[in-house]
From Swiss-Prot:
Catalyzed reaction equations: D-fructose 6-phosphate + L-glutamine = D-glucosamine 6-phosphate + L-glutamate
UniProt cross-references to InterPro entries, sorted A to Z: GATase_2_dom (IPR017932), GFAT (IPR005855), GFAT_N (IPR047084), GlmS/AgaS_SIS (IPR035466), GlmS/FrlB_SIS (IPR035490), Ntn_hydrolases_N (IPR029055), SIS_dom (IPR001347), SIS_dom_sf (IPR046348)
Organismal lineage: Bacteria, Bacillati, Actinomycetota, Actinomycetes, Mycobacteriales
Gene Ontology annotations of biological process type: carbohydrate metabolic process; fructose 6-phosphate metabolic process; protein N-linked glycosylation; UDP-N-acetylglucosamine metabolic process
Record-linked HAMAP family: GlmS
EC number: 2.6.1.16
Keywords assigned by UniProt, alphabetized: Aminotransferase, Cytoplasm, Glutamine amidotransferase, Repeat, Transferase
Record domain SIS: where: 295-435, 468-613
Role noted for this protein: Catalyzes the first step in hexosamine metabolism, converting fructose-6P into glucosamine-6P using glutamine as a nitrogen source.
Gene Ontology CC: one annotated term: cytosol
Descriptive protein name: Glutamine--fructose-6-phosphate aminotransferase [isomerizing]
Amino acid sequence: MCGIVGYIGQAGDTRNYYALDVVLEGLRRLEYRGYDSAGVAVYADGEISFRKKAGKVAALETEIARAPLPDSVLGIGHTRWATHGGPTDVNAHPHVVAGGRLAVVHNGIIENFSELRAELTAKGYNFVSSTDTEVAATLLAEIYKTEAEGDLTRAMQLTGQRLDGAFTLLAIHVDHPDRIVAARRNSPLVIGLGEGENFLGSDVSGFIDYTRSAVELSNDQVVTITADSYEITDFHGAPSEGKPFAVEWDAAAAEKGGFHSFMDKEIHDQPAAVRDTLLGRMDEDGKLMLDELRIDESILRSVDKIIVVACGTAAYAGQVARYAIEHWCRIPTEVELAHEFRYRDPIVNEKTLVVALSQSGETMDTLMAVRHAREQGAKVVAICNTVGSTLPREADACLYTYAGPEIAVASTKAFLAQITASYLLGLYLAQLRGNKFADEVRVILDSLREMPAKIQEVIDNEEQIKQLGRSMVDAKSVLFLGRHVGYPVALEGALKLKEIAYLHAEGFAAGELKHGPIALVEDGQPVFVIVPSPRGRDSLHAKVVSNIQEIRARGAVTIVIAEEGDTAVDEHANYIIRIPQAPTLMQPLLATVPLQIFACAVATEKGFDVDQPRNLAKSVTVE
Protein backbone atom coordinates (compact mmCIF):
# COMPACT_ATOMS: atom_id res chain seq x y z
CA MET A 1 0.00 0.00 0.00
CA CYS A 2 1.70 3.19 -1.26
CA GLY A 3 5.24 3.34 -2.52
CA ILE A 4 8.25 5.51 -1.68
CA VAL A 5 11.47 6.14 -3.61
CA GLY A 6 14.45 8.34 -2.81
CA TYR A 7 17.66 8.96 -4.76
CA ILE A 8 20.85 10.92 -4.21
CA GLY A 9 23.83 11.01 -6.57
CA GLN A 10 26.89 13.19 -7.07
CA ALA A 11 26.79 16.45 -8.97
CA GLY A 12 28.89 16.42 -12.12
CA ASP A 13 29.11 12.64 -12.51
CA THR A 14 28.90 11.03 -15.93
CA ARG A 15 25.75 8.98 -15.50
CA ASN A 16 23.14 9.27 -18.21
CA TYR A 17 20.26 9.72 -15.76
CA TYR A 18 19.13 12.15 -13.09
CA ALA A 19 17.18 11.83 -9.87
CA LEU A 20 13.88 12.30 -11.66
CA ASP A 21 14.59 9.36 -13.98
CA VAL A 22 15.40 7.07 -11.06
CA VAL A 23 12.43 8.16 -8.99
CA LEU A 24 9.89 7.82 -11.80
CA GLU A 25 11.22 4.40 -12.76
CA GLY A 26 11.04 3.38 -9.11
CA LEU A 27 7.44 4.55 -8.86
CA ARG A 28 6.54 2.56 -11.95
CA ARG A 29 8.15 -0.51 -10.39
CA LEU A 30 6.06 0.05 -7.24
CA GLU A 31 2.75 0.43 -9.07
CA TYR A 32 1.82 -3.14 -8.16
CA ARG A 33 1.38 -1.98 -4.54
CA GLY A 34 -1.70 0.00 -5.54
CA TYR A 35 -2.21 3.78 -5.45
CA ASP A 36 -4.47 6.61 -6.51
CA SER A 37 -2.04 9.54 -6.90
CA ALA A 38 1.66 10.15 -7.43
CA GLY A 39 4.22 12.89 -6.97
CA VAL A 40 7.92 13.79 -6.99
CA ALA A 41 10.17 16.49 -5.56
CA VAL A 42 13.73 17.37 -6.64
CA TYR A 43 16.33 19.81 -5.38
CA ALA A 44 18.30 22.03 -7.77
CA ASP A 45 19.89 25.49 -7.61
CA GLY A 46 18.81 26.20 -4.04
CA GLU A 47 15.16 25.30 -4.56
CA ILE A 48 12.81 22.35 -4.19
CA SER A 49 10.59 21.81 -7.22
CA PHE A 50 7.73 19.35 -7.19
CA ARG A 51 4.86 17.97 -9.22
CA LYS A 52 1.98 15.79 -8.00
CA LYS A 53 -1.16 14.47 -9.60
CA ALA A 54 -4.19 12.35 -8.78
CA GLY A 55 -4.28 9.25 -10.95
CA LYS A 56 -1.52 7.03 -12.29
CA VAL A 57 2.20 7.66 -12.72
CA ALA A 58 1.46 8.24 -16.40
CA ALA A 59 -0.67 11.26 -15.43
CA LEU A 60 2.22 12.59 -13.36
CA GLU A 61 4.59 12.13 -16.29
CA THR A 62 2.18 14.06 -18.50
CA GLU A 63 2.17 16.88 -15.96
CA ILE A 64 5.99 16.90 -15.85
CA ALA A 65 6.13 17.00 -19.65
CA ARG A 66 3.84 20.03 -19.52
CA ALA A 67 5.86 21.71 -16.74
CA PRO A 68 9.37 20.20 -16.72
CA LEU A 69 11.44 19.80 -13.57
CA PRO A 70 15.13 20.78 -13.44
CA ASP A 71 17.96 18.26 -13.73
CA SER A 72 18.93 17.16 -10.25
CA VAL A 73 20.85 14.51 -8.32
CA LEU A 74 18.50 14.62 -5.30
CA GLY A 75 14.87 13.55 -5.40
CA ILE A 76 12.04 11.76 -3.63
CA GLY A 77 8.80 10.30 -4.97
CA HIS A 78 5.60 8.71 -3.77
CA THR A 79 2.55 6.79 -4.89
CA ARG A 80 -0.35 7.31 -2.49
CA TRP A 81 -3.19 5.04 -1.44
CA ALA A 82 -5.68 7.46 0.13
CA THR A 83 -6.38 7.09 3.86
CA HIS A 84 -6.83 10.56 5.37
CA GLY A 85 -8.31 12.71 2.64
CA GLY A 86 -9.49 11.72 -0.81
CA PRO A 87 -7.34 11.01 -3.89
CA THR A 88 -6.83 14.61 -5.07
CA ASP A 89 -3.93 16.69 -6.37
CA VAL A 90 -3.82 18.64 -3.09
CA ASN A 91 -3.70 15.51 -0.92
CA ALA A 92 -1.07 13.82 -3.09
CA HIS A 93 2.55 13.72 -1.89
CA PRO A 94 5.06 15.28 -1.57
CA HIS A 95 3.90 17.88 0.93
CA VAL A 96 6.12 20.93 0.72
CA VAL A 97 6.14 23.15 3.81
CA ALA A 98 8.28 25.79 5.54
CA GLY A 99 7.91 28.20 2.67
CA GLY A 100 8.98 25.62 0.12
CA ARG A 101 12.14 24.67 1.99
CA LEU A 102 11.13 21.17 3.16
CA ALA A 103 9.51 18.33 1.18
CA VAL A 104 8.15 15.17 2.78
CA VAL A 105 6.61 11.93 1.54
CA HIS A 106 5.00 9.41 3.86
CA ASN A 107 3.59 5.89 3.93
CA GLY A 108 1.36 4.71 6.76
CA ILE A 109 -1.18 6.18 9.15
CA ILE A 110 -0.42 8.75 11.85
CA GLU A 111 -2.86 7.85 14.61
CA ASN A 112 -2.47 11.05 16.65
CA PHE A 113 -2.56 13.45 13.70
CA SER A 114 -5.75 15.17 14.93
CA GLU A 115 -4.14 16.19 18.22
CA LEU A 116 -0.94 17.26 16.45
CA ARG A 117 -2.90 19.27 13.90
CA ALA A 118 -4.75 21.10 16.68
CA GLU A 119 -1.46 21.79 18.46
CA LEU A 120 0.18 23.15 15.32
CA THR A 121 -2.88 25.19 14.37
CA ALA A 122 -2.73 26.84 17.79
CA LYS A 123 0.85 27.84 16.96
CA GLY A 124 -0.33 29.60 13.82
CA TYR A 125 0.22 26.95 11.15
CA ASN A 126 -2.31 26.59 8.35
CA PHE A 127 -3.03 23.41 6.42
CA VAL A 128 -4.04 23.12 2.78
CA SER A 129 -4.79 19.39 2.70
CA SER A 130 -6.76 16.96 4.85
CA THR A 131 -3.89 14.48 5.19
CA ASP A 132 -1.98 13.23 8.19
CA THR A 133 1.18 13.60 6.09
CA GLU A 134 1.00 17.39 5.95
CA VAL A 135 0.68 17.35 9.74
CA ALA A 136 3.81 15.20 10.06
CA ALA A 137 5.70 17.44 7.61
CA THR A 138 4.66 20.58 9.49
CA LEU A 139 5.66 19.02 12.81
CA LEU A 140 9.07 18.15 11.32
CA ALA A 141 9.48 21.75 10.12
CA GLU A 142 8.51 23.12 13.54
CA ILE A 143 10.93 20.83 15.39
CA TYR A 144 13.69 21.59 12.85
CA LYS A 145 13.27 25.29 13.59
CA THR A 146 12.68 25.27 17.35
CA GLU A 147 14.34 22.19 18.86
CA ALA A 148 16.84 20.66 16.44
CA GLU A 149 18.74 23.87 15.67
CA GLY A 150 18.72 23.21 11.93
CA ASP A 151 19.83 19.57 12.19
CA LEU A 152 17.51 17.61 9.88
CA THR A 153 18.52 14.22 11.25
CA ARG A 154 17.89 15.32 14.83
CA ALA A 155 14.57 16.85 13.79
CA MET A 156 13.51 13.52 12.25
CA GLN A 157 14.49 11.65 15.42
CA LEU A 158 12.40 13.98 17.58
CA THR A 159 9.50 13.83 15.13
CA GLY A 160 9.56 10.03 15.27
CA GLN A 161 9.19 10.23 19.04
CA ARG A 162 6.07 12.39 18.69
CA LEU A 163 4.21 10.29 16.11
CA ASP A 164 1.91 7.38 16.93
CA GLY A 165 0.96 4.74 14.40
CA ALA A 166 2.76 3.32 11.39
CA PHE A 167 4.91 5.48 9.16
CA THR A 168 7.81 5.79 6.79
CA LEU A 169 8.91 9.39 6.25
CA LEU A 170 11.41 10.75 3.70
CA ALA A 171 12.49 14.38 3.82
CA ILE A 172 14.72 16.73 1.84
CA HIS A 173 15.56 20.31 2.86
CA VAL A 174 17.14 23.16 0.94
CA ASP A 175 19.60 23.66 3.82
CA HIS A 176 20.91 20.12 3.28
CA PRO A 177 21.18 19.49 -0.47
CA ASP A 178 23.53 16.56 0.08
CA ARG A 179 21.20 14.20 1.94
CA ILE A 180 17.85 12.51 2.40
CA VAL A 181 16.69 11.78 5.94
CA ALA A 182 14.14 9.05 6.60
CA ALA A 183 12.43 7.32 9.52
CA ARG A 184 10.36 4.17 9.87
CA ARG A 185 7.99 2.50 12.32
CA ASN A 186 5.82 -0.47 11.33
CA SER A 187 6.11 0.49 7.67
CA PRO A 188 8.80 -0.88 5.34
CA LEU A 189 11.92 0.97 4.21
CA VAL A 190 15.02 -0.37 2.48
CA ILE A 191 18.33 1.34 1.61
CA GLY A 192 19.89 0.62 -1.79
CA LEU A 193 23.66 0.99 -1.92
CA GLY A 194 25.34 2.11 -5.14
CA GLU A 195 28.72 3.56 -6.11
CA GLY A 196 28.57 7.31 -5.69
CA GLU A 197 24.79 7.07 -5.35
CA ASN A 198 22.33 5.68 -2.82
CA PHE A 199 18.64 4.88 -2.82
CA LEU A 200 15.64 4.47 -0.54
CA GLY A 201 12.53 2.45 -1.30
CA SER A 202 9.46 0.84 0.21
CA ASP A 203 10.96 -2.34 -1.15
CA VAL A 204 13.79 -3.25 -3.48
CA SER A 205 11.56 -2.91 -6.54
CA GLY A 206 12.07 0.83 -6.25
CA PHE A 207 15.76 0.62 -7.14
CA ILE A 208 16.42 -2.91 -8.43
CA ASP A 209 17.44 -1.62 -11.87
CA TYR A 210 20.39 0.22 -10.29
CA THR A 211 21.74 -1.93 -7.45
CA ARG A 212 21.37 -5.35 -5.83
CA SER A 213 23.02 -4.35 -2.55
CA ALA A 214 20.55 -3.36 0.14
CA VAL A 215 20.08 -2.72 3.86
CA GLU A 216 16.81 -3.37 5.67
CA LEU A 217 15.85 -0.95 8.42
CA SER A 218 14.19 -1.98 11.68
CA ASN A 219 11.44 -0.24 13.60
CA ASP A 220 12.08 3.16 15.19
CA GLN A 221 15.18 3.90 13.14
CA VAL A 222 16.30 7.03 11.32
CA VAL A 223 18.65 6.89 8.35
CA THR A 224 20.56 9.71 6.70
CA ILE A 225 21.89 8.93 3.24
CA THR A 226 24.33 10.91 1.13
CA ALA A 227 25.76 9.95 -2.25
CA ASP A 228 28.53 7.88 -0.68
CA SER A 229 27.41 7.00 2.86
CA TYR A 230 24.56 6.19 5.18
CA GLU A 231 24.13 6.50 8.93
CA ILE A 232 21.46 4.79 11.05
CA THR A 233 20.32 5.83 14.52
CA ASP A 234 17.35 5.11 16.74
CA PHE A 235 14.77 7.80 17.55
CA HIS A 236 16.88 8.94 20.49
CA GLY A 237 20.04 9.46 18.45
CA ALA A 238 21.93 6.35 19.51
CA PRO A 239 23.89 4.64 16.71
CA SER A 240 22.07 1.64 15.28
CA GLU A 241 22.47 -0.92 12.51
CA GLY A 242 20.43 -2.26 9.62
CA LYS A 243 20.43 -5.71 8.06
CA PRO A 244 22.53 -5.88 4.86
CA PHE A 245 21.42 -8.32 2.17
CA ALA A 246 21.98 -9.02 -1.50
CA VAL A 247 18.99 -8.92 -3.83
CA GLU A 248 19.01 -12.11 -5.86
CA TRP A 249 15.64 -11.65 -7.59
CA ASP A 250 14.93 -10.06 -10.91
CA ALA A 251 12.60 -7.09 -11.22
CA ALA A 252 9.48 -9.22 -11.70
CA ALA A 253 10.28 -11.31 -8.64
CA ALA A 254 11.06 -8.21 -6.62
CA GLU A 255 7.47 -7.07 -7.00
CA LYS A 256 6.53 -10.33 -5.28
CA GLY A 257 9.03 -9.67 -2.51
CA GLY A 258 11.01 -12.74 -3.53
CA PHE A 259 8.04 -15.06 -3.05
CA HIS A 260 7.03 -17.67 -5.60
CA SER A 261 3.73 -15.95 -6.28
CA PHE A 262 1.68 -12.92 -5.33
CA MET A 263 -0.63 -15.23 -3.39
CA ASP A 264 2.28 -16.50 -1.32
CA LYS A 265 3.38 -12.92 -0.70
CA GLU A 266 -0.13 -11.85 0.24
CA ILE A 267 -0.44 -14.69 2.73
CA HIS A 268 2.70 -13.31 4.36
CA ASP A 269 1.24 -9.78 4.21
CA GLN A 270 -1.63 -10.74 6.52
CA PRO A 271 -0.16 -9.65 9.86
CA ALA A 272 0.36 -6.17 8.38
CA ALA A 273 -3.09 -6.19 6.74
CA VAL A 274 -4.82 -6.80 10.07
CA ARG A 275 -2.56 -4.39 11.93
CA ASP A 276 -3.05 -1.60 9.39
CA THR A 277 -6.83 -2.08 9.39
CA LEU A 278 -6.79 -1.50 13.16
CA LEU A 279 -4.51 1.54 13.00
CA GLY A 280 -5.99 4.93 13.78
CA ARG A 281 -9.32 3.56 14.95
CA MET A 282 -8.79 3.76 18.70
CA ASP A 283 -8.07 6.79 20.83
CA GLU A 284 -5.41 6.95 23.55
CA ASP A 285 -7.91 5.66 26.13
CA GLY A 286 -8.68 2.59 24.04
CA LYS A 287 -12.09 3.85 22.93
CA LEU A 288 -13.12 2.81 19.44
CA MET A 289 -13.27 5.76 17.03
CA LEU A 290 -14.73 5.21 13.56
CA ASP A 291 -14.74 8.73 12.16
CA GLU A 292 -15.49 7.34 8.70
CA LEU A 293 -18.89 6.09 9.85
CA ARG A 294 -20.75 9.25 8.90
CA ILE A 295 -24.24 8.00 9.73
CA ASP A 296 -26.23 9.80 12.42
CA GLU A 297 -25.81 8.03 15.76
CA SER A 298 -29.56 8.08 16.39
CA ILE A 299 -30.07 6.09 13.19
CA LEU A 300 -27.46 3.53 14.20
CA ARG A 301 -29.04 3.19 17.63
CA SER A 302 -32.41 2.45 16.03
CA VAL A 303 -31.14 -0.34 13.76
CA ASP A 304 -33.17 -3.50 14.39
CA LYS A 305 -31.66 -5.74 11.71
CA ILE A 306 -28.33 -6.05 9.94
CA ILE A 307 -27.95 -7.69 6.54
CA VAL A 308 -24.48 -8.47 5.20
CA VAL A 309 -24.33 -8.73 1.40
CA ALA A 310 -21.29 -10.11 -0.40
CA CYS A 311 -20.05 -12.78 -2.80
CA GLY A 312 -17.45 -15.53 -2.59
CA THR A 313 -14.76 -15.13 0.03
CA ALA A 314 -16.26 -11.84 1.20
CA ALA A 315 -19.52 -13.66 1.97
CA TYR A 316 -17.62 -16.07 4.21
CA ALA A 317 -16.05 -13.11 5.99
CA GLY A 318 -19.60 -11.87 6.51
CA GLN A 319 -20.61 -15.23 7.96
CA VAL A 320 -17.78 -15.00 10.48
CA ALA A 321 -18.79 -11.45 11.33
CA ARG A 322 -22.41 -12.48 11.96
CA TYR A 323 -21.42 -14.52 15.01
CA ALA A 324 -19.55 -11.56 16.50
CA ILE A 325 -22.11 -8.86 15.66
CA GLU A 326 -25.04 -10.79 17.08
CA HIS A 327 -23.05 -11.70 20.18
CA TRP A 328 -21.84 -8.16 20.86
CA CYS A 329 -24.77 -6.07 19.61
CA ARG A 330 -27.76 -8.40 20.11
CA ILE A 331 -29.04 -7.32 16.69
CA PRO A 332 -30.44 -10.03 14.38
CA THR A 333 -27.92 -10.39 11.55
CA GLU A 334 -28.34 -12.13 8.22
CA VAL A 335 -25.73 -12.89 5.57
CA GLU A 336 -26.97 -12.86 1.99
CA LEU A 337 -25.26 -13.73 -1.25
CA ALA A 338 -25.52 -10.42 -3.07
CA HIS A 339 -26.67 -12.00 -6.32
CA GLU A 340 -29.62 -13.68 -4.54
CA PHE A 341 -30.55 -10.78 -2.28
CA ARG A 342 -32.63 -8.56 -4.50
CA TYR A 343 -34.41 -11.38 -6.28
CA ARG A 344 -36.17 -12.79 -3.22
CA ASP A 345 -38.09 -9.69 -2.07
CA PRO A 346 -36.09 -9.20 1.16
CA ILE A 347 -37.63 -7.43 4.13
CA VAL A 348 -35.68 -4.17 4.28
CA ASN A 349 -36.68 -0.80 5.72
CA GLU A 350 -35.25 2.37 7.26
CA LYS A 351 -34.24 0.46 10.41
CA THR A 352 -32.16 -2.02 8.43
CA LEU A 353 -28.40 -1.59 8.21
CA VAL A 354 -26.89 -3.25 5.15
CA VAL A 355 -23.17 -4.03 5.32
CA ALA A 356 -21.65 -4.60 1.87
CA LEU A 357 -18.29 -6.36 1.64
CA SER A 358 -16.13 -6.17 -1.49
CA GLN A 359 -12.36 -6.13 -1.88
CA SER A 360 -12.47 -4.30 -5.20
CA GLY A 361 -15.53 -2.15 -4.59
CA GLU A 362 -16.63 -2.99 -8.14
CA THR A 363 -18.40 -6.34 -7.66
CA MET A 364 -21.54 -5.82 -9.74
CA ASP A 365 -23.74 -8.22 -7.79
CA THR A 366 -22.89 -6.41 -4.56
CA LEU A 367 -23.46 -3.00 -6.13
CA MET A 368 -26.89 -4.06 -7.37
CA ALA A 369 -27.78 -5.38 -3.91
CA VAL A 370 -26.72 -2.06 -2.37
CA ARG A 371 -28.82 -0.08 -4.83
CA HIS A 372 -31.84 -2.24 -4.06
CA ALA A 373 -31.33 -1.84 -0.30
CA ARG A 374 -31.09 1.93 -0.54
CA GLU A 375 -34.25 2.05 -2.63
CA GLN A 376 -35.99 0.36 0.31
CA GLY A 377 -34.71 3.00 2.74
CA ALA A 378 -31.85 1.07 4.34
CA LYS A 379 -28.56 2.66 5.31
CA VAL A 380 -25.50 1.03 3.77
CA VAL A 381 -22.00 0.69 5.21
CA ALA A 382 -19.36 -0.53 2.76
CA ILE A 383 -16.31 -2.50 3.84
CA CYS A 384 -13.89 -2.12 0.96
CA ASN A 385 -10.19 -2.26 0.15
CA THR A 386 -10.11 0.12 -2.82
CA VAL A 387 -10.31 3.86 -2.34
CA GLY A 388 -12.21 5.65 -5.08
CA SER A 389 -14.11 2.58 -6.25
CA THR A 390 -17.85 2.56 -6.89
CA LEU A 391 -19.06 0.85 -3.72
CA PRO A 392 -17.82 3.50 -1.24
CA ARG A 393 -19.35 6.22 -3.40
CA GLU A 394 -22.75 4.55 -3.42
CA ALA A 395 -22.78 3.63 0.28
CA ASP A 396 -23.74 5.96 3.11
CA ALA A 397 -20.39 5.31 4.80
CA CYS A 398 -17.30 3.20 4.23
CA LEU A 399 -14.82 1.42 6.46
CA TYR A 400 -11.69 0.83 4.42
CA THR A 401 -9.58 -2.25 4.94
CA TYR A 402 -5.96 -1.21 4.68
CA ALA A 403 -4.75 -4.53 3.32
CA GLY A 404 -2.95 -2.97 0.38
CA PRO A 405 -3.49 -4.19 -3.18
CA GLU A 406 -4.35 -7.84 -3.58
CA ILE A 407 -3.04 -9.04 -6.93
CA ALA A 408 -3.75 -12.77 -6.77
CA VAL A 409 -7.26 -13.67 -7.87
CA ALA A 410 -7.84 -15.91 -4.84
CA SER A 411 -8.35 -13.63 -1.86
CA THR A 412 -6.25 -14.07 1.28
CA LYS A 413 -5.31 -10.91 3.15
CA ALA A 414 -8.50 -9.11 2.13
CA PHE A 415 -10.49 -11.88 3.87
CA LEU A 416 -8.75 -11.34 7.21
CA ALA A 417 -8.97 -7.56 6.81
CA GLN A 418 -12.71 -7.80 6.08
CA ILE A 419 -13.25 -9.83 9.25
CA THR A 420 -11.22 -7.28 11.21
CA ALA A 421 -13.16 -4.30 9.85
CA SER A 422 -16.48 -6.09 10.42
CA TYR A 423 -15.47 -6.72 14.02
CA LEU A 424 -14.66 -3.03 14.44
CA LEU A 425 -18.09 -2.14 13.10
CA GLY A 426 -19.76 -4.61 15.46
CA LEU A 427 -17.85 -3.30 18.46
CA TYR A 428 -18.63 0.29 17.52
CA LEU A 429 -22.35 -0.47 17.35
CA ALA A 430 -22.19 -2.31 20.67
CA GLN A 431 -20.35 0.65 22.22
CA LEU A 432 -22.81 3.15 20.74
CA ARG A 433 -25.91 1.21 21.77
CA GLY A 434 -24.65 0.44 25.27
CA ASN A 435 -24.51 -3.33 24.76
CA LYS A 436 -20.88 -3.33 25.80
CA PHE A 437 -19.16 -1.14 28.37
CA ALA A 438 -15.94 0.64 27.46
CA ASP A 439 -13.79 -1.77 29.46
CA GLU A 440 -15.39 -4.76 27.69
CA VAL A 441 -14.75 -3.22 24.28
CA ARG A 442 -11.17 -2.49 25.30
CA VAL A 443 -10.57 -6.13 26.25
CA ILE A 444 -11.84 -7.31 22.85
CA LEU A 445 -9.77 -4.68 21.04
CA ASP A 446 -6.71 -5.82 22.97
CA SER A 447 -7.36 -9.34 21.67
CA LEU A 448 -7.63 -7.98 18.13
CA ARG A 449 -4.36 -6.11 18.52
CA GLU A 450 -2.65 -9.37 19.48
CA MET A 451 -3.75 -11.08 16.28
CA PRO A 452 -1.02 -9.81 13.87
CA ALA A 453 1.72 -11.37 16.00
CA LYS A 454 -0.24 -14.59 16.35
CA ILE A 455 -0.93 -14.75 12.61
CA GLN A 456 2.82 -14.42 12.11
CA GLU A 457 3.35 -17.41 14.41
CA VAL A 458 1.12 -19.49 12.13
CA ILE A 459 3.00 -18.32 9.03
CA ASP A 460 6.31 -19.16 10.69
CA ASN A 461 5.12 -22.78 10.75
CA GLU A 462 4.38 -22.81 7.01
CA GLU A 463 6.92 -25.46 6.01
CA GLN A 464 5.02 -28.18 7.91
CA ILE A 465 1.82 -27.14 6.12
CA LYS A 466 3.51 -26.95 2.71
CA GLN A 467 4.93 -30.46 3.15
CA LEU A 468 1.45 -31.69 3.97
CA GLY A 469 0.11 -30.03 0.83
CA ARG A 470 2.79 -31.55 -1.36
CA SER A 471 2.06 -35.01 0.10
CA MET A 472 -1.63 -34.73 -0.85
CA VAL A 473 -1.19 -33.55 -4.40
CA ASP A 474 -2.86 -36.71 -5.73
CA ALA A 475 -5.98 -36.42 -3.59
CA LYS A 476 -9.22 -36.47 -5.58
CA SER A 477 -11.31 -34.68 -2.98
CA VAL A 478 -10.82 -32.89 0.34
CA LEU A 479 -13.50 -32.17 2.94
CA PHE A 480 -13.51 -29.39 5.53
CA LEU A 481 -15.50 -29.39 8.78
CA GLY A 482 -16.12 -26.69 11.36
CA ARG A 483 -18.63 -25.50 13.93
CA HIS A 484 -19.63 -22.00 15.01
CA VAL A 485 -17.06 -19.56 13.53
CA GLY A 486 -15.13 -22.58 12.30
CA TYR A 487 -17.89 -23.35 9.80
CA PRO A 488 -17.30 -20.36 7.47
CA VAL A 489 -13.56 -21.02 7.86
CA ALA A 490 -14.21 -24.53 6.52
CA LEU A 491 -16.15 -23.06 3.61
CA GLU A 492 -13.30 -20.66 2.83
CA GLY A 493 -10.71 -23.45 3.03
CA ALA A 494 -12.69 -25.49 0.52
CA LEU A 495 -13.11 -22.51 -1.79
CA LYS A 496 -9.36 -21.84 -1.87
CA LEU A 497 -8.65 -25.41 -2.91
CA LYS A 498 -11.30 -25.25 -5.65
CA GLU A 499 -10.09 -21.90 -6.95
CA ILE A 500 -6.39 -22.55 -7.36
CA ALA A 501 -5.84 -26.33 -7.24
CA TYR A 502 -8.94 -27.23 -9.32
CA LEU A 503 -9.64 -29.92 -6.74
CA HIS A 504 -13.07 -31.02 -5.57
CA ALA A 505 -13.51 -29.70 -2.05
CA GLU A 506 -16.52 -29.14 0.19
CA GLY A 507 -16.98 -27.39 3.48
CA PHE A 508 -19.64 -28.51 5.95
CA ALA A 509 -20.94 -27.61 9.36
CA ALA A 510 -19.65 -30.51 11.43
CA GLY A 511 -23.08 -31.06 12.95
CA GLU A 512 -24.38 -31.89 9.48
CA LEU A 513 -22.18 -34.98 9.17
CA LYS A 514 -24.88 -37.45 10.18
CA HIS A 515 -27.37 -35.74 7.90
CA GLY A 516 -25.60 -36.74 4.71
CA PRO A 517 -21.96 -35.68 4.21
CA ILE A 518 -20.54 -38.60 6.21
CA ALA A 519 -21.49 -40.78 3.23
CA LEU A 520 -18.59 -39.14 1.36
CA VAL A 521 -16.03 -40.37 3.87
CA GLU A 522 -14.10 -43.43 2.75
CA ASP A 523 -10.72 -44.94 3.37
CA GLY A 524 -7.96 -42.38 2.75
CA GLN A 525 -10.33 -39.39 2.40
CA PRO A 526 -8.51 -36.22 3.61
CA VAL A 527 -10.68 -34.22 6.02
CA PHE A 528 -9.68 -30.92 7.63
CA VAL A 529 -11.33 -30.21 10.96
CA ILE A 530 -11.26 -26.78 12.57
CA VAL A 531 -11.44 -27.40 16.31
CA PRO A 532 -12.82 -24.68 18.60
CA SER A 533 -10.94 -23.75 21.73
CA PRO A 534 -11.55 -26.03 24.72
CA ARG A 535 -11.41 -22.83 26.78
CA GLY A 536 -14.57 -21.57 25.09
CA ARG A 537 -17.76 -23.56 24.93
CA ASP A 538 -16.75 -26.97 26.30
CA SER A 539 -19.73 -28.72 24.71
CA LEU A 540 -18.81 -27.36 21.27
CA HIS A 541 -15.23 -28.57 21.61
CA ALA A 542 -16.36 -32.01 22.76
CA LYS A 543 -18.78 -32.34 19.85
CA VAL A 544 -16.05 -31.57 17.30
CA VAL A 545 -13.70 -34.10 18.91
CA SER A 546 -16.55 -36.61 18.60
CA ASN A 547 -16.88 -35.69 14.90
CA ILE A 548 -13.17 -36.40 14.41
CA GLN A 549 -13.63 -39.83 15.98
CA GLU A 550 -16.58 -40.55 13.68
CA ILE A 551 -14.74 -39.81 10.45
CA ARG A 552 -11.50 -41.42 11.63
CA ALA A 553 -13.43 -44.63 12.31
CA ARG A 554 -14.54 -44.61 8.67
CA GLY A 555 -11.01 -44.37 7.30
CA ALA A 556 -10.59 -40.61 6.92
CA VAL A 557 -7.16 -39.01 7.04
CA THR A 558 -7.83 -36.35 9.66
CA ILE A 559 -5.98 -33.04 9.51
CA VAL A 560 -6.82 -31.16 12.66
CA ILE A 561 -6.34 -27.44 13.22
CA ALA A 562 -6.29 -26.99 16.98
CA GLU A 563 -4.88 -24.47 19.38
CA GLU A 564 -1.72 -25.06 21.37
CA GLY A 565 -2.33 -27.11 24.50
CA ASP A 566 -5.43 -28.89 23.20
CA THR A 567 -4.42 -32.50 23.88
CA ALA A 568 -7.91 -33.94 23.43
CA VAL A 569 -7.35 -34.20 19.66
CA ASP A 570 -3.97 -35.91 19.77
CA GLU A 571 -5.07 -39.54 19.56
CA HIS A 572 -7.69 -38.89 16.89
CA ALA A 573 -5.64 -36.90 14.35
CA ASN A 574 -3.36 -38.10 11.59
CA TYR A 575 -1.91 -34.60 11.33
CA ILE A 576 -2.17 -31.68 13.74
CA ILE A 577 -1.58 -28.06 12.77
CA ARG A 578 -1.23 -25.94 15.89
CA ILE A 579 -2.38 -22.34 16.13
CA PRO A 580 -1.86 -19.94 19.06
CA GLN A 581 -4.48 -19.73 21.77
CA ALA A 582 -7.09 -17.05 21.14
CA PRO A 583 -10.67 -16.21 22.12
CA THR A 584 -13.29 -18.09 20.09
CA LEU A 585 -14.27 -15.13 17.91
CA MET A 586 -10.61 -14.41 17.07
CA GLN A 587 -9.86 -17.96 15.96
CA PRO A 588 -10.90 -17.47 12.29
CA LEU A 589 -8.06 -14.95 11.87
CA LEU A 590 -5.66 -17.77 12.74
CA ALA A 591 -7.34 -20.97 11.53
CA THR A 592 -7.82 -19.66 7.98
CA VAL A 593 -4.10 -19.15 7.36
CA PRO A 594 -3.03 -22.84 7.29
CA LEU A 595 -5.82 -23.55 4.80
CA GLN A 596 -4.51 -20.81 2.50
CA ILE A 597 -0.95 -22.14 2.75
CA PHE A 598 -2.14 -25.70 2.11
CA ALA A 599 -4.12 -24.74 -1.01
CA CYS A 600 -1.21 -22.70 -2.37
CA ALA A 601 1.19 -25.61 -1.80
CA VAL A 602 -1.07 -28.14 -3.55
CA ALA A 603 -1.62 -25.86 -6.54
CA THR A 604 2.07 -25.00 -6.81
CA GLU A 605 3.05 -28.68 -6.67
CA LYS A 606 0.57 -29.37 -9.47
CA GLY A 607 2.25 -26.67 -11.55
CA PHE A 608 -0.74 -24.33 -11.69
CA ASP A 609 -0.63 -20.54 -11.82
CA VAL A 610 -1.91 -19.70 -8.34
CA ASP A 611 -2.16 -15.98 -9.10
CA GLN A 612 -4.35 -16.32 -12.18
CA PRO A 613 -6.41 -19.51 -11.95
CA ARG A 614 -8.42 -20.57 -14.95
CA ASN A 615 -11.86 -19.10 -15.63
CA LEU A 616 -11.67 -16.59 -12.77
CA ALA A 617 -11.26 -12.81 -12.59
CA LYS A 618 -10.15 -10.67 -9.67
CA SER A 619 -13.05 -8.25 -9.94
CA VAL A 620 -16.40 -9.57 -11.16
CA THR A 621 -17.94 -6.51 -12.78
CA VAL A 622 -20.89 -8.22 -14.47
CA GLU A 623 -23.92 -9.92 -12.95
